[in-house]
Amino acid sequence: MSSAIKILALLMVLVALAQAKPRKDYRAYPDFDDKSVILEDDKRCDPDKRDSVCKDVCGMLDIGTENGECPGKEVCCVDLFGR
């Protein structure tokens, strides 16, 4: 009886692990500057802000894509160190 409970608990853990979404690690992208913060993926950068940089989603950062398809938008990155 206790072995059945152990098997059931193991199955529940495996199902929970299978359903968990993997967290995207942006450090894996060489073009992503970790000194930048991504504010929003669906707005263009404010041209009045000198510290904001627009980066294209396609090719540089895989942010704001749906199933790997590029929406043609830009992401707004703000350099935390004021460069």
Swiss-Prot record:
Phenylalanine amide: which positions carry it?
Answer: 81
The primary site where this protein sits is: secreted
Q: Does the keyword Signal apply?
A: yes
Q: Which UniProt keywords apply?
A: Amidation, Cleavage on pair of basic residues, Disulfide bond, Nematocyst, Neurotoxin, Secreted, Signal, Toxin
Q: How is it modified after translation?
A: Contains 3 disulfide bonds.
Where can this protein be found? Secreted; Nematocyst
GO CC terms, sorted: extracellular region; nematocyst
User: From which residue to which does the signal peptide run?
Assistant: 1-20
Positions annotated as propeptide: 21-44
Determine if Lipid metabolism is one of this entry's keywords.
no
What GO molecular function annotations does the UniProt record carry, in alphabetical order?
toxin activity
Q: What does this protein do?
A: In vivo, induces immediate paralysis on shrimps (C.multidentata), followed by death when high doses are injected. No activity is observed when injected into fly larvae (M.domestica).
Q: What is this protein called?
A: Toxin CjTL8
